A protein has these predicted regions:
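Acidic/His- and Gly-rich active-site-bordering loop/insert found
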Residues: 2-118, 135-141, 149
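Acidic/histidine-rich catalytic neighborhood of metal-dependent amide-processing enzymes
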Residues: 117, 121-162
């Protein structure tokens, strides 16, 4: 696939990727004491479904008791090709003060979309999904993805997931 073909493939999926990012950002997956951990589980389930739709044949939600769930996905390497590991996280910090709009209701202003967690790191999740879509669900390398739900509280169980 040439750079031009890859760019065209990314462009063809851009609206879908942006829409999915906005849906993911609307899930208040706050990873902090005093917040409902169910929203982090909901976020993990949404991420798992995104990865399945993108073409990953093996997608699992992982989590030891008491942990916020991580999502693992893999695509086998073609013969002789390397495997890459991609990382992102789907949890966010509490919104805090200073928002001009509800933090979990994505809004577009001046060509940019704003919502809690959209840059850190739900866009990273969609970047991985978009790369898989751009390759038509069949990348030229093996791909393993880990998307954790505890980065904002110190990645307490990341080693367990790996």
């Amino acid at each position: 696939m040439t750079h031009q073909h890859l760019k065209e493939a990314v462009d063809s999926h851009f609206e879908t990727i942006q829409s999915e990012l906005e849906h993911l950002a609307a899930i208040p997956s706050v990873s902090a004491a005093g917040f409902d951990p169910e929203s982090v589980r909901e976020s993990a389930e949404y991420v798992a479904n995104l990865l399945r739709k993108a073409g990953f044949p093996d997608v699992r939600i992982l989590g030891p008791p008491g942990a916020h769930p991580a999502v693992y996905a893999s695509y086998p390497a073609p013969e002789g090709a390397p495997t890459v590991l991609l990382y992102a996280h789907h949890d966010v910090q509490p919104a805090g003060e200073g928002w001009n709009s509800p933090p979990f209701e994505p809004i577009e202003r001046n060509g940019r979309v704003y919502a809690r967690g959209i840059a850190d790191d739900k866009s990273g999740v969609l970047m991985h999904v978009g790369a898989m879509l751009a390759h038509g669900g069949t990348p030229p390398v093996g791909v393993k993805v880990i998307i954790e739900g505890e980065e904002e509280i110190g990645s307490l169980h990341l080693e367990d997931f790996l």
